């Protein structure tokens, strides 16, 4: 029996406020919704009232920030999930946002351990230093 995924805002200490979640993923069209745990996490999060965003690792970028401003950004796609495993999501917009703008950033990209993957972990580590809440610690993924 599959374990039910729960994304309770109280688990994050946010007193019932919905979360703005960013999933750093492989290209969305390459995800197999019927077996991909990331898709299951996105569906569960949305079911519990949270906002779901996705970004490819290649869209993570560094901008030289002004003092006190974030420097790590991504091209984030706002998604709504669907129960259909072939047409499992709908993009409802995209914008360039700092990673710090999200309540949680979840690194869900599968290796290969190539330069894009390593660069993504460096940028995620930098975003963490800027105050972003990054889950799946970048250094642990890389080292």
Can you name each region flagged by the protein language model?
Residues 4-9:
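Intrinsically disordered, low-complexity segments enriched in serine/proline and basic residues
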Residues 13-15:
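Short, positively charged and aromatic/hydrophobic N-terminal segments
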Residues 17-18, 29-143:
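Conserved N-proximal alpha/beta basic substrate-recognition cap immediately N-terminal to
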């Amino acid at each position: 029996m599959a374990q039910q995924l729960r994304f309770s805002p109280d688990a994050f200490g946010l007193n019932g406020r919905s979360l703005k979640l960013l999933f750093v993923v492989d290209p969305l069209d390459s995800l197999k919704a019927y077996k991909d745990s990331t898709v299951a996490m996105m569906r569960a999060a949305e079911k519990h009232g949270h906002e779901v965003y996705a970004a490819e690792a290649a869209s993570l970028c560094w901008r030289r920030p002004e003092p006190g401003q974030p420097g790590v950004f991504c091209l984030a796609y706002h998604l709504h999930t669907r129960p259909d495993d072939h047409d499992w999501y709908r993009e409802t917009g995209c914008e360039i946002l700092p990673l710090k703008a999200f309540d949680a950033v979840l690194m869900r990209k599968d290796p290969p351990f190539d330069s894009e993957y390593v660069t993504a972990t460096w940028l995620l580590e930098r975003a963490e230093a800027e105050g972003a809440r990054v889950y799946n610690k970048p250094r642990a993924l890389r080292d």
